[in-house]
């Protein structure tokens, strides 16, 4: 997954984005190899873990300067600047290097649309853009304020 997004980011010149959806349909879960969908909070737990692993691949596997592209010396990379990622979690395992060189953004622009308390916390921690709905301006303003406050709690500058 991380490699696909890195590849797309290269192909688009750094314009790829990811709308992170935890899913709610059993059919979607079966498409991911599960018998049934996870419970609501467990879906966010799995999403947190998935992002932790992909962040490590995007941001921690290849140091700046690892790609040399020295044709004369026939050296593409400096292997001492490429590191394996080891993630052994409850839902996912990763053991190896990121299989694509760093892309223009390294980490794509992240969108999220969670409306539950857990979903908004997830969005506040990770997303650069959040889909919101609200019947009135005051309702929407309150949601924006709550998410901005939560983002600050995660050390982010909304």
Regions found by a protein language model. Give the residues of each.
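Residues at alpha-helix caps and immediate loop-helix transition turns in enzyme cores, especially N-
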Residues: 1-4, 143
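Short, solvent-exposed amphipathic alpha-helical segments in soluble enzyme
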Residues: 6, 127-128, 146-149
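Short catalytic-loop micro-motif centered on adjacent basic/acidic residues
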Residues: 111, 131-132
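Catalytic cores of nucleotide-enabled group-transfer and carboxylate-activating enzymes in metabolic
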Residues: 117-118, 132-134, 138-140, 145-157
């Amino acid at each position: 997954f991380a490699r696909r997004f890195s590849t797309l980011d290269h192909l688009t010149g750094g314009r790829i984005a990811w709308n992170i959806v935890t899913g709610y349909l059993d059919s979607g879960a079966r498409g991911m190899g599960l018998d049934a969908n996870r419970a609501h909070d467990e879906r966010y737990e799995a999403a947190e873990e998935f992002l932790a692993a992909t962040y490590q691949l995007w941001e921690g596997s290849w140091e700046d300067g690892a790609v040399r592209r020295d044709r004369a010396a026939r050296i593409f990379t400096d292997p001492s600047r490429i590191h394996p990622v080891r993630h052994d979690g409850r839902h996912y395992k990763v053991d190896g290097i990121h299989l694509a060189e760093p892309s223009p953004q390294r980490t794509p622009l992240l969108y999220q649309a969670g409306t539950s308390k857990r979903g908004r916390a997830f969005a506040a921690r990770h997303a650069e853009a959040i889909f919101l709905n609200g019947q009135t301006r005051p309702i929407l303003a309150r949601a924006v304020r709550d998410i901005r406050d939560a983002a600050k709690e995660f050390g982010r500058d909304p």
